[in-house]
């Protein structure tokens, strides 16, 4: 009995000692966890401080980025203003330069020999512009259709089909330009057929009819043909003004798009258009004077057609992607249609006038042959000028 009590007491004491020891270990564990938590909190504070530092640094980067973006916007506005100023200045300069040159050309009678040479030069310029510049430029393949030309055979066939369809489209619009200009001229002749003179060349036709009454009857038919010839050429002069205006629109589109791509390209395009316009404007001036306009009337009309270049330039600068507009303008109906008009004016209106010029003067056969040779050389000079411009471009 005593042994059982002693064993029970010993068990109680040992159990109490074990509980106290485990309790101490438990509290020591809690303390280590507290220390661990305290250490972790210290590390968290460091991370928080580092996060605040990163946040401040991020704010500083945002401020700097906003400042840079603001400077880029200001620079972009200045660049846009520069493009507008350069483009419009180039267009105005190209328009004024030929008109200034025209003042130094001596005024002559419609059948003057020097004016006939200018007329032949203008015919060559029209043919060269249409056949050596406008049509080849419209037929040339564009970069976007040949960027991946070597990928596979089917893509090559697609490019070939695209080029063929483009050639057909350009040829169709050239023919359309010729037919439309012919129909317009026929319409003008029909409208003017019942009148002896129009509003613009009334004095010229009236003077010619006055001379008909003064000359002998044997010369009346020849004079009547000359009067009708003046009326016919007048219609072609208006057609030439329309074609020149449309052509100037395409020049303005090219200049605006070039300056949008870069100043260097813009000035190169400006020089090319200027070299192209100088002989072109001289020929147009000769056609207008030959049609019955006075020298200063012809210069004013040439200045009016220059508004087409300004219109095209402004439109090119207003669009979002001028470069693509320039490519679309080159392959659209505008340029080949204008080329057809130039071909019609040169071959139907100007060249026949040159062929008939020797029939109305009292020159020997040798002198007429020499005059025809000079006209051919003037046509070749006009074509040659456009050939050089095409090479430079």
Curated annotation (Swiss-Prot):
Primary localization class, coarse: membrane
Keyword entries, A-Z: Differentiation, Glycoprotein, Ion transport, Membrane, Spermatogenesis, Transmembrane, Transmembrane helix, Transport, Zinc, Zinc transport
Database matches in InterPro entries: ZIP (IPR003689)
Coiled coil ranges: none
Ranges where the record places region Disordered: 142-163
One GO process term, biological-process aspect: zinc ion transmembrane transport
Observed phenotype of the null mutant: Reduced brood size, but the majority of hermaphrodites are sterile and lay a large number of unfertilized oocytes. Defective spermatid activation. Double knockout with spe-4 results in failed spermatocyte division. Double knockout with spe-6 results in suppression of the premature spermatid activation phenotype of the single spe-6 (hc163) mutant.
A GO molecular-function descriptor: zinc ion transmembrane transporter activity
Residues annotated as transmembrane: 85-105, 117-137, 171-191, 255-275, 303-323, 332-352, 372-392
KW Membrane (keyword) present: yes
Cellular component GO terms, alphabetical: membrane
Record's note on what induces expression: By cholesterol.
Carbohydrate-modified residues: 66, 152, 248, 362
Top-level taxonomic group: Eukaryota
Keyword Lipid biosynthesis: no
Membrane topology: Multi-pass membrane protein
Localization per record: Membrane
Tissues where this protein is expressed: Highly expressed in developing spermatids (at the protein level). Expressed in the germline.
Recorded family membership: Belongs to the ZIP transporter (TC 2.A.5) family. KE4/Catsup subfamily.
Role of this protein: Zinc transporter which regulates intracellular zinc levels. Required for spermatogenesis in both hermaphrodites and males where it resides in an inactive form in immature sperm, spermatids, but is likely activated in response to reduced spe-4 and spe-6 function. Upon activation, mediates the release of zinc from internal stores in spermatids into the cytoplasm. The resulting increase in cytoplasmic zinc levels promotes spermatid activation and subsequent differentiation into mature motile sperm that are capable of fertilization.
Name of protein: Zinc transporter zipt-7.1
The gene coding this protein: zipt-7.1
């Amino acid at each position: 009995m005593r042994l059982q009590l002693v064993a029970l007491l010993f068990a109680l004491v040992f159990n109490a000692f074990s509980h106290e020891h485990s309790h101490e270990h438990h509290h020591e564990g809690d303390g280590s966890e507290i220390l661990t938590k305290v250490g972790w909190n210290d590390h968290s504070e460091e991370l928080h401080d580092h996060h605040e530092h990163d946040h401040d640094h991020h704010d500083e980067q945002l401020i700097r980025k906003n400042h840079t973006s603001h400077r880029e916007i200001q620079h972009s506005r200045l660049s846009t203003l520069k493009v507008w100023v350069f483009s419009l200045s180039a267009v105005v300069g190209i328009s004024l330069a030929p008109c200034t040159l025209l003042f130094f050309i001596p005024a002559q009678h419609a059948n003057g020999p020097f004016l006939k040479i200018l007329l032949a030069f203008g015919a060559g310029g029209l043919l060269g512009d249409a056949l050596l510049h406008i049509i080849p430029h419209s037929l040339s393949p564009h970069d976007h259709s040949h960027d991946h030309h070597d990928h596979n055979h089917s893509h090559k066939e697609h490019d070939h089909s695209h080029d063929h369809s483009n050639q057909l489209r350009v040829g169709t619009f050239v023919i359309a330009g010729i037919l439309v200009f012919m129909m317009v001229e026929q319409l003008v002749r029909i409208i003017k057929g019942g009148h002896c003179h129009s509003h613009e060349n009334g004095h010229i036709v009236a003077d010619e009819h006055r001379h008909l009454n003064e000359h002998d009857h044997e010369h009346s038919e020849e004079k009547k043909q000359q009067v009708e010839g003046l009326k016919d050429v007048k219609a072609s002069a208006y057609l030439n003004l329309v074609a020149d205006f449309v052509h100037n629109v395409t020049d303005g589109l090219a200049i605006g798009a070039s300056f949008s791509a870069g100043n260097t390209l813009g000035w190169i395009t400006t020089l090319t258009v200027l070299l192209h316009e100088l002989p072109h404007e001289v020929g147009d001036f000769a056609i207008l004077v030959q049609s019955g306009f006075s020298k200063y009337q012809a210069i004013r009309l040439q200045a009016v057609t220059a508004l087409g270049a300004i219109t095209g330039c402004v439109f090119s600068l207003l669009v979002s992607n001028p470069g693509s507009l320039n490519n679309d303008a080159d392959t659209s109906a505008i340029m080949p249609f204008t080329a057809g008009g130039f071909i019609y004016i040169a071959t139907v209106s100007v060249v026949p006038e040159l062929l008939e010029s020797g029939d109305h003067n009292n020159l020997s056969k040798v002198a007429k042959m020499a005059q025809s040779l000079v006209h051919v050389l003037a046509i070749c000079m006009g074509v040659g000028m456009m050939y050089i411009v095409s090479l430079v471009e």
